[in-house]
């Protein structure tokens, strides 16, 4: 047995546990999950986006619907990440309601930037419904609208 490797692992264990606890604490409220979702979209972190969505998430946008996490991953996730990276959104208003198991987060935004050679200046509304399970809060529904 390599005692140096074991000693190094034992020395690193507290920091690994702290990092894990910190990540859990960072996603302890519906609002922090919504913020993490948008941060992952803008940062191009596909796996982080998908990890925050329930498998059976329903996503409504511009009259269209994606009926699962897998469908979203294979259809609009890429372009949503590209749009989020190219633009800047400012939260104008946010409200939350619900209880310990189900919560909703309503957000109004102003978005600006250039996307695919087109100037963007839009007001948006977003409704997210989250459900709390064994693995924490997951997004079960998103409805986006903008003008």
Task: Walk through the language-model features, giving the residues of each.
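N-terminal, post-signal-peptide region of Sec/Tat-exported proteins
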Residues: 46-82
């Amino acid at each position: 047995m390599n005692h140096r490797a074991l000693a190094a692992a034992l020395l690193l264990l507290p920091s690994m546990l702290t990092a894990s606890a910190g990540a859990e604490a960072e996603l302890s409220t519906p609002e922090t999950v919504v913020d993490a979702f948008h941060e992952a979209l803008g940062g191009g972190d596909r796996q982080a986006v998908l990890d925050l969505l329930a498998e059976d998430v329903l996503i409504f946008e511009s009259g269209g619907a994606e009926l699962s996490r897998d469908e979203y991953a294979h259809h609009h996730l890429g372009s949503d990440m590209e749009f989020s990276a190219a633009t800047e959104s400012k939260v104008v208003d946010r409200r939350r309601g619900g209880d310990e198991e189900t919560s909703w987060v309503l957000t109004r935004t102003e978005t600006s930037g250039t996307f695919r050679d087109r100037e963007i200046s839009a007001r948006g509304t977003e409704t997210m419904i989250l459900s709390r399970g064994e693995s924490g809060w997951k997004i079960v529904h998103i409805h986006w609208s903008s003008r």
